[in-house]
Amino acid sequence: MGVDLQVTVNLDHPELLDAPVLETGVLSAEGRALPTPPRPRIVGVGTAVTRTSYSQQEVLDAFGITDRKVRSIFLNSAIERRNLTLPPMDSDSVRVSESQGDLLDKHKKLAIEMGAEALHACLKRCGAELSDLRHLCCVTSTGFLTPGLSALLIRELGIDRHCSRSDIVGMGCNAGLNALNVVAGWSAAHPGELAVVLCAEACSAAYTMDSTMRTAVVNSLFGDGAAAVALLAGPGGATPATSEGPTVLKFASCIIPEAVDAMRYDWDRTQGRFSFFLDPQIPYVVGAHAETVVDRLLSGTGLRRSDIGHWLVHSGGKKVIDAVVVNLGLTRHDVRHTIGVLRDQGNVSSGSFLFSYERLLEEGITRPGEYGVLMTMGPGSTIETALVQW
Protein backbone atom coordinates (compact mmCIF):
# COMPACT_ATOMS: atom_id res chain seq x y z
CA MET A 1 0.00 0.00 0.00
CA GLY A 2 1.52 3.33 -1.09
CA VAL A 3 1.30 6.74 0.53
CA ASP A 4 1.13 10.00 -1.44
CA LEU A 5 3.80 12.48 -0.43
CA GLN A 6 3.19 16.20 -0.77
CA VAL A 7 6.00 18.45 -1.94
CA THR A 8 5.66 22.21 -1.67
CA VAL A 9 6.98 24.46 -4.41
CA ASN A 10 6.25 28.03 -5.45
CA LEU A 11 5.19 27.58 -9.07
CA ASP A 12 3.87 31.09 -9.58
CA HIS A 13 6.93 33.01 -8.43
CA PRO A 14 9.95 30.67 -8.14
CA GLU A 15 12.24 33.68 -8.14
CA LEU A 16 10.95 34.77 -4.73
CA LEU A 17 13.18 32.53 -2.63
CA ASP A 18 12.17 34.20 0.62
CA ALA A 19 8.45 34.22 -0.14
CA PRO A 20 6.17 31.84 1.79
CA VAL A 21 5.42 28.72 -0.21
CA LEU A 22 1.79 28.05 -1.07
CA GLU A 23 1.65 25.76 -4.10
CA THR A 24 1.49 22.01 -3.52
CA GLY A 25 2.51 19.25 -5.88
CA VAL A 26 1.89 15.51 -5.27
CA LEU A 27 4.04 12.43 -5.80
CA SER A 28 2.33 9.15 -6.57
CA ALA A 29 3.12 5.93 -4.68
CA GLU A 30 5.57 5.10 -7.47
CA GLY A 31 7.35 8.41 -6.98
CA ARG A 32 6.09 9.96 -10.20
CA ALA A 33 5.09 13.60 -10.22
CA LEU A 34 1.37 14.06 -10.73
CA PRO A 35 0.16 17.20 -12.48
CA THR A 36 -0.87 19.97 -10.12
CA PRO A 37 -4.32 21.39 -10.93
CA PRO A 38 -3.84 24.90 -12.31
CA ARG A 39 -4.78 27.70 -9.98
CA PRO A 40 -7.32 30.22 -11.26
CA ARG A 41 -6.26 33.80 -11.83
CA ILE A 42 -8.33 36.95 -11.80
CA VAL A 43 -7.96 38.27 -15.34
CA GLY A 44 -10.47 41.10 -15.50
CA VAL A 45 -12.94 43.24 -13.58
CA GLY A 46 -15.69 45.65 -14.55
CA THR A 47 -18.28 47.68 -12.67
CA ALA A 48 -21.46 49.57 -13.45
CA VAL A 49 -23.98 51.74 -11.61
CA THR A 50 -27.39 53.16 -12.38
CA ARG A 51 -27.67 56.49 -14.16
CA THR A 52 -28.71 58.81 -11.33
CA SER A 53 -26.58 59.76 -8.33
CA TYR A 54 -27.77 61.53 -5.19
CA SER A 55 -26.12 63.11 -2.18
CA GLN A 56 -27.49 62.12 1.22
CA GLN A 57 -29.08 65.55 1.53
CA GLU A 58 -30.78 65.11 -1.84
CA VAL A 59 -32.26 61.77 -0.73
CA LEU A 60 -33.60 63.37 2.45
CA ASP A 61 -35.14 66.18 0.42
CA ALA A 62 -36.61 63.78 -2.15
CA PHE A 63 -38.64 62.00 0.51
CA GLY A 64 -39.33 65.05 2.67
CA ILE A 65 -37.55 63.57 5.70
CA THR A 66 -37.36 66.12 8.53
CA ASP A 67 -36.87 63.95 11.63
CA ARG A 68 -33.60 65.09 13.26
CA LYS A 69 -32.50 61.62 14.32
CA VAL A 70 -33.10 60.14 10.88
CA ARG A 71 -31.32 63.04 9.20
CA SER A 72 -28.36 62.57 11.52
CA ILE A 73 -28.05 58.91 10.48
CA PHE A 74 -27.94 59.91 6.80
CA LEU A 75 -25.56 62.82 7.22
CA ASN A 76 -23.08 61.03 9.50
CA SER A 77 -22.79 57.83 7.46
CA ALA A 78 -19.42 58.63 5.78
CA ILE A 79 -21.36 58.40 2.49
CA GLU A 80 -21.35 61.41 0.17
CA ARG A 81 -23.22 60.03 -2.83
CA ARG A 82 -25.05 56.90 -3.98
CA ASN A 83 -26.45 55.76 -7.30
CA LEU A 84 -30.16 55.17 -6.80
CA THR A 85 -33.30 54.80 -8.90
CA LEU A 86 -35.95 56.66 -6.94
CA PRO A 87 -39.69 56.25 -7.57
CA PRO A 88 -41.29 58.78 -9.94
CA MET A 89 -43.17 61.81 -8.64
CA ASP A 90 -46.91 62.27 -8.86
CA SER A 91 -48.75 65.41 -10.00
CA ASP A 92 -48.11 67.00 -6.58
CA SER A 93 -44.34 66.38 -6.85
CA VAL A 94 -44.50 63.64 -4.22
CA ARG A 95 -42.63 60.37 -4.72
CA VAL A 96 -45.16 57.64 -5.47
CA SER A 97 -45.39 54.55 -3.30
CA GLU A 98 -43.98 51.44 -5.01
CA SER A 99 -45.63 48.06 -4.42
CA GLN A 100 -43.63 44.87 -3.99
CA GLY A 101 -44.51 44.01 -7.57
CA ASP A 102 -43.13 47.37 -8.74
CA LEU A 103 -39.92 46.70 -6.82
CA LEU A 104 -39.48 43.24 -8.34
CA ASP A 105 -39.94 44.72 -11.82
CA LYS A 106 -37.39 47.41 -10.99
CA HIS A 107 -34.92 44.82 -9.76
CA LYS A 108 -35.21 42.77 -12.93
CA LYS A 109 -34.74 45.79 -15.19
CA LEU A 110 -31.80 47.28 -13.29
CA ALA A 111 -30.04 43.97 -12.69
CA ILE A 112 -30.08 43.18 -16.40
CA GLU A 113 -28.98 46.70 -17.41
CA MET A 114 -26.19 47.05 -14.84
CA GLY A 115 -25.17 43.42 -15.15
CA ALA A 116 -24.75 43.66 -18.91
CA GLU A 117 -22.69 46.83 -18.60
CA ALA A 118 -20.41 45.37 -15.91
CA LEU A 119 -19.96 42.15 -17.89
CA HIS A 120 -18.99 44.03 -21.06
CA ALA A 121 -16.52 46.17 -19.09
CA CYS A 122 -14.96 43.10 -17.49
CA LEU A 123 -14.53 41.26 -20.78
CA LYS A 124 -13.08 44.36 -22.44
CA ARG A 125 -10.51 44.68 -19.68
CA CYS A 126 -9.26 41.13 -20.20
CA GLY A 127 -9.39 41.33 -23.99
CA ALA A 128 -12.20 38.78 -24.32
CA GLU A 129 -15.52 38.62 -26.14
CA LEU A 130 -18.92 37.28 -25.11
CA SER A 131 -18.20 34.29 -27.34
CA ASP A 132 -15.22 33.39 -25.11
CA LEU A 133 -17.41 32.99 -22.02
CA ARG A 134 -17.83 29.41 -20.81
CA HIS A 135 -19.37 29.85 -17.35
CA LEU A 136 -21.50 32.67 -15.95
CA CYS A 137 -22.32 32.84 -12.25
CA CYS A 138 -24.77 35.58 -11.26
CA VAL A 139 -25.20 36.86 -7.71
CA THR A 140 -28.08 38.92 -6.35
CA SER A 141 -30.00 39.40 -3.12
CA THR A 142 -32.11 42.45 -3.90
CA GLY A 143 -34.79 40.57 -5.82
CA PHE A 144 -35.92 37.11 -6.82
CA LEU A 145 -35.88 35.88 -10.41
CA THR A 146 -36.84 32.54 -11.94
CA PRO A 147 -35.39 31.90 -14.48
CA GLY A 148 -32.31 33.36 -12.85
CA LEU A 149 -30.36 36.43 -13.88
CA SER A 150 -27.82 34.25 -15.71
CA ALA A 151 -30.50 32.92 -18.07
CA LEU A 152 -31.93 36.39 -18.65
CA LEU A 153 -28.51 37.80 -19.51
CA ILE A 154 -27.71 34.91 -21.85
CA ARG A 155 -30.91 35.72 -23.75
CA GLU A 156 -30.43 39.49 -23.58
CA LEU A 157 -26.81 39.48 -24.77
CA GLY A 158 -26.91 36.53 -27.13
CA ILE A 159 -24.37 34.51 -25.15
CA ASP A 160 -23.79 30.97 -26.45
CA ARG A 161 -26.63 28.71 -25.30
CA HIS A 162 -24.06 26.10 -24.26
CA CYS A 163 -22.45 28.44 -21.73
CA SER A 164 -22.79 26.78 -18.33
CA ARG A 165 -24.28 28.92 -15.58
CA SER A 166 -25.11 29.19 -11.91
CA ASP A 167 -27.02 31.64 -9.73
CA ILE A 168 -26.38 32.50 -6.09
CA VAL A 169 -29.47 34.18 -4.67
CA GLY A 170 -30.20 35.51 -1.21
CA MET A 171 -26.80 35.12 0.47
CA GLY A 172 -26.44 38.88 0.92
CA CYS A 173 -23.38 41.11 1.00
CA ASN A 174 -20.91 38.27 1.51
CA ALA A 175 -22.11 36.38 -1.58
CA GLY A 176 -19.56 37.72 -4.04
CA LEU A 177 -16.79 35.74 -2.35
CA ASN A 178 -18.99 32.67 -2.01
CA ALA A 179 -19.45 32.83 -5.77
CA LEU A 180 -15.74 33.41 -6.37
CA ASN A 181 -15.01 30.28 -4.34
CA VAL A 182 -17.42 28.16 -6.39
CA VAL A 183 -16.26 29.53 -9.73
CA ALA A 184 -12.59 29.17 -8.81
CA GLY A 185 -13.32 25.46 -8.44
CA TRP A 186 -15.03 25.40 -11.83
CA SER A 187 -12.07 27.19 -13.41
CA ALA A 188 -9.54 24.75 -11.95
CA ALA A 189 -11.59 21.88 -13.39
CA HIS A 190 -11.81 23.58 -16.81
CA PRO A 191 -8.34 25.00 -17.54
CA GLY A 192 -8.17 27.49 -20.35
CA GLU A 193 -11.90 28.29 -20.21
CA LEU A 194 -13.14 31.73 -19.18
CA ALA A 195 -15.56 32.11 -16.26
CA VAL A 196 -17.19 35.24 -14.86
CA VAL A 197 -18.78 36.03 -11.51
CA LEU A 198 -21.33 38.82 -11.90
CA CYS A 199 -22.85 40.56 -8.86
CA ALA A 200 -25.86 42.77 -9.67
CA GLU A 201 -27.62 44.51 -6.79
CA ALA A 202 -30.51 46.91 -7.36
CA CYS A 203 -30.74 48.17 -3.79
CA SER A 204 -33.30 50.77 -4.93
CA ALA A 205 -35.65 47.80 -5.35
CA ALA A 206 -35.21 46.60 -1.77
CA TYR A 207 -36.44 49.30 0.56
CA THR A 208 -39.38 50.28 2.69
CA MET A 209 -40.42 53.61 4.21
CA ASP A 210 -41.45 54.13 7.82
CA SER A 211 -40.38 56.20 10.81
CA THR A 212 -38.20 53.59 12.55
CA MET A 213 -34.47 53.94 13.15
CA ARG A 214 -34.04 50.43 11.73
CA THR A 215 -35.37 51.59 8.37
CA ALA A 216 -33.41 54.84 8.52
CA VAL A 217 -30.11 52.97 8.86
CA VAL A 218 -30.88 50.73 5.89
CA ASN A 219 -32.14 53.56 3.68
CA SER A 220 -29.05 55.65 4.44
CA LEU A 221 -26.60 52.92 3.46
CA PHE A 222 -27.22 51.03 0.21
CA GLY A 223 -26.68 51.97 -3.43
CA ASP A 224 -27.22 50.36 -6.84
CA GLY A 225 -24.23 48.65 -8.41
CA ALA A 226 -22.96 45.68 -10.40
CA ALA A 227 -19.48 44.20 -10.62
CA ALA A 228 -18.03 41.37 -12.70
CA VAL A 229 -14.77 39.49 -12.25
CA ALA A 230 -13.26 37.06 -14.77
CA LEU A 231 -11.30 33.92 -13.85
CA LEU A 232 -9.02 31.74 -15.94
CA ALA A 233 -6.92 28.74 -14.90
CA GLY A 234 -3.97 27.48 -16.90
CA PRO A 235 -3.29 28.53 -20.50
CA GLY A 236 -5.85 30.68 -22.21
CA GLY A 237 -4.33 33.41 -24.29
CA ALA A 238 -2.93 35.67 -21.58
CA THR A 239 -2.47 39.29 -22.63
CA PRO A 240 -0.86 42.31 -20.94
CA ALA A 241 -4.36 43.18 -19.73
CA THR A 242 -4.85 39.84 -17.99
CA SER A 243 -1.39 39.70 -16.43
CA GLU A 244 -2.30 42.40 -13.89
CA GLY A 245 -4.53 40.06 -11.91
CA PRO A 246 -3.58 37.83 -8.97
CA THR A 247 -3.76 34.07 -8.54
CA VAL A 248 -6.48 32.84 -6.17
CA LEU A 249 -4.80 30.68 -3.53
CA LYS A 250 -7.19 29.92 -0.71
CA PHE A 251 -10.56 30.66 0.91
CA ALA A 252 -11.74 30.66 4.52
CA SER A 253 -15.22 31.19 5.99
CA CYS A 254 -16.73 31.85 9.39
CA ILE A 255 -20.43 31.75 10.16
CA ILE A 256 -21.66 32.99 13.53
CA PRO A 257 -24.84 30.98 14.22
CA GLU A 258 -25.74 32.87 17.38
CA ALA A 259 -26.06 36.00 15.22
CA VAL A 260 -28.13 34.35 12.48
CA ASP A 261 -30.94 36.91 12.90
CA ALA A 262 -28.68 39.97 13.08
CA MET A 263 -28.83 40.66 9.32
CA ARG A 264 -32.03 39.78 7.50
CA TYR A 265 -33.97 40.54 4.36
CA ASP A 266 -37.37 38.99 4.94
CA TRP A 267 -41.09 39.59 4.67
CA ASP A 268 -42.50 42.48 6.69
CA ARG A 269 -46.17 41.67 7.24
CA THR A 270 -46.92 45.21 8.39
CA GLN A 271 -45.48 46.77 5.25
CA GLY A 272 -46.57 43.97 2.92
CA ARG A 273 -43.12 43.73 1.36
CA PHE A 274 -39.60 42.50 1.94
CA SER A 275 -37.39 44.67 4.13
CA PHE A 276 -33.90 44.68 5.62
CA PHE A 277 -33.09 44.35 9.28
CA LEU A 278 -29.62 45.27 10.52
CA ASP A 279 -28.90 44.74 14.22
CA PRO A 280 -26.96 47.64 15.82
CA GLN A 281 -24.49 45.07 17.20
CA ILE A 282 -23.35 43.92 13.73
CA PRO A 283 -20.11 45.94 13.69
CA TYR A 284 -19.05 44.42 16.99
CA VAL A 285 -20.01 40.89 15.92
CA VAL A 286 -18.02 41.23 12.70
CA GLY A 287 -15.07 42.83 14.44
CA ALA A 288 -14.94 40.17 17.14
CA HIS A 289 -14.64 37.38 14.55
CA ALA A 290 -12.52 39.07 11.87
CA GLU A 291 -9.24 38.04 13.45
CA THR A 292 -10.32 34.41 13.76
CA VAL A 293 -11.23 33.95 10.10
CA VAL A 294 -8.17 35.80 8.77
CA ASP A 295 -5.88 33.71 10.97
CA ARG A 296 -7.57 30.60 9.62
CA LEU A 297 -7.06 31.87 6.07
CA LEU A 298 -3.34 32.35 6.67
CA SER A 299 -2.90 29.13 8.64
CA GLY A 300 -0.40 26.80 6.99
CA THR A 301 0.86 29.41 4.54
CA GLY A 302 3.71 30.80 6.61
CA LEU A 303 2.18 34.24 6.23
CA ARG A 304 1.37 36.75 8.94
CA ARG A 305 -1.09 39.59 8.70
CA SER A 306 1.84 41.98 8.36
CA ASP A 307 2.83 40.16 5.14
CA ILE A 308 -0.42 41.14 3.42
CA GLY A 309 0.15 44.11 1.15
CA HIS A 310 -3.41 44.71 0.00
CA TRP A 311 -6.71 44.53 1.91
CA LEU A 312 -9.95 44.64 -0.07
CA VAL A 313 -12.83 44.71 2.40
CA HIS A 314 -16.58 44.94 1.84
CA SER A 315 -17.88 48.50 2.25
CA GLY A 316 -20.43 47.41 4.84
CA GLY A 317 -20.75 50.75 6.60
CA LYS A 318 -18.62 53.16 8.62
CA LYS A 319 -18.80 51.23 11.89
CA VAL A 320 -18.22 47.85 10.23
CA ILE A 321 -15.08 49.13 8.51
CA ASP A 322 -13.84 50.67 11.76
CA ALA A 323 -14.40 47.38 13.59
CA VAL A 324 -12.39 45.43 11.00
CA VAL A 325 -9.56 47.98 11.08
CA VAL A 326 -9.29 47.91 14.87
CA ASN A 327 -9.51 44.15 15.29
CA LEU A 328 -7.05 43.31 12.49
CA GLY A 329 -4.61 46.07 13.40
CA LEU A 330 -4.95 47.76 10.01
CA THR A 331 -4.57 51.41 9.08
CA ARG A 332 -7.01 53.68 7.29
CA HIS A 333 -4.61 53.59 4.35
CA ASP A 334 -4.91 49.79 4.22
CA VAL A 335 -8.65 50.10 3.60
CA ARG A 336 -8.58 53.31 1.55
CA HIS A 337 -10.35 51.63 -1.38
CA THR A 338 -13.10 50.35 0.91
CA ILE A 339 -13.56 53.78 2.47
CA GLY A 340 -13.61 55.41 -0.97
CA VAL A 341 -16.24 53.03 -2.33
CA LEU A 342 -18.46 53.64 0.71
CA ARG A 343 -18.04 57.40 0.28
CA ASP A 344 -18.81 57.45 -3.45
CA GLN A 345 -21.24 54.53 -3.90
CA GLY A 346 -22.53 53.52 -0.48
CA ASN A 347 -22.84 49.81 0.25
CA VAL A 348 -23.45 48.11 -3.11
CA SER A 349 -23.86 44.73 -1.41
CA SER A 350 -22.26 41.60 -2.90
CA GLY A 351 -20.06 43.41 -5.44
CA SER A 352 -18.59 46.02 -3.08
CA PHE A 353 -15.20 44.30 -2.73
CA LEU A 354 -14.84 44.21 -6.53
CA PHE A 355 -15.35 47.98 -6.71
CA SER A 356 -12.42 48.20 -4.25
CA TYR A 357 -10.37 45.75 -6.32
CA GLU A 358 -10.93 47.88 -9.41
CA ARG A 359 -9.65 50.95 -7.56
CA LEU A 360 -6.53 49.06 -6.49
CA LEU A 361 -5.82 48.08 -10.10
CA GLU A 362 -6.24 51.68 -11.21
CA GLU A 363 -3.50 52.71 -8.77
CA GLY A 364 -1.09 50.39 -10.60
CA ILE A 365 0.95 49.67 -7.47
CA THR A 366 0.76 45.88 -7.14
CA ARG A 367 4.00 43.95 -7.63
CA PRO A 368 4.70 40.28 -8.42
CA GLY A 369 4.83 38.19 -5.27
CA GLU A 370 2.64 40.49 -3.18
CA TYR A 371 -0.32 39.04 -1.29
CA GLY A 372 -3.82 40.36 -0.82
CA VAL A 373 -6.82 39.46 1.32
CA LEU A 374 -10.39 39.87 0.10
CA MET A 375 -13.05 40.05 2.82
CA THR A 376 -16.83 40.23 2.72
CA MET A 377 -19.44 39.94 5.44
CA GLY A 378 -23.19 39.49 5.46
CA PRO A 379 -26.22 37.55 6.75
CA GLY A 380 -25.61 34.38 8.68
CA SER A 381 -23.85 36.23 10.20
CA THR A 382 -20.96 35.38 7.88
CA ILE A 383 -17.42 36.50 7.10
CA GLU A 384 -15.84 35.25 3.88
CA THR A 385 -12.18 35.66 2.94
CA ALA A 386 -9.84 34.85 0.07
CA LEU A 387 -6.05 34.94 -0.21
CA VAL A 388 -4.56 36.04 -3.54
CA GLN A 389 -1.04 36.56 -4.87
CA TRP A 390 0.20 38.76 -7.70
Curated annotation (Swiss-Prot):
Active site (UniProt): 173
One function term, GO molecular function aspect: acyltransferase activity, transferring groups other than amino-acyl groups
Disulfide bond annotation, renumbered to this chain: none
Biological role: Involved in the biosynthesis of the nonproteinogenic amino acid monomer (S)-3,5-dihydroxyphenylglycine (Dpg) responsible of the production of vancomycin and teicoplanin antibiotics. Catalyzes the Claisen condensation of four molecules of malonyl-CoA to yield 3,5-dihydroxyphenylacetyl-CoA (DPA-CoA) and three free coenzyme A (CoA). DpgA requires the presence of the dehydratases DpgB and DpgD to facilitate the aromatization of the DPA-S-DgpA or DPA-S-CoA intermediate.
Family: Belongs to the thiolase-like superfamily. Chalcone/stilbene synthases family.
UniProt KW keywords: Antibiotic biosynthesis, Transferase
InterPro entries, per database record: Chalcone/stilbene_synt_C, Chalcone/stilbene_synt_N, DPA-CoA_Synthase, Polyketide_synthase_type-III, Thiolase-like
Pathway where it operates: Antibiotic biosynthesis; vancomycin biosynthesis
Name of the protein described by the UniProt record: 3,5-dihydroxyphenylacetyl-CoA synthase
Pfam families linked to this entry: Chal_sti_synt_C, Chal_sti_synt_N
Catalytic reaction equation(s): 4 malonyl-CoA + 4 H(+) = (3,5-dihydroxyphenyl)acetyl-CoA + 4 CO2 + 3 CoA + H2O
Gene Ontology BP annotations: polyketide biosynthetic process; vancomycin biosynthetic process
Organism from which the protein derives: Streptomyces toyocaensis
Its EC number(s): 2.3.1.246
Gene3D superfamilies associated with the record: 3.40.47.10
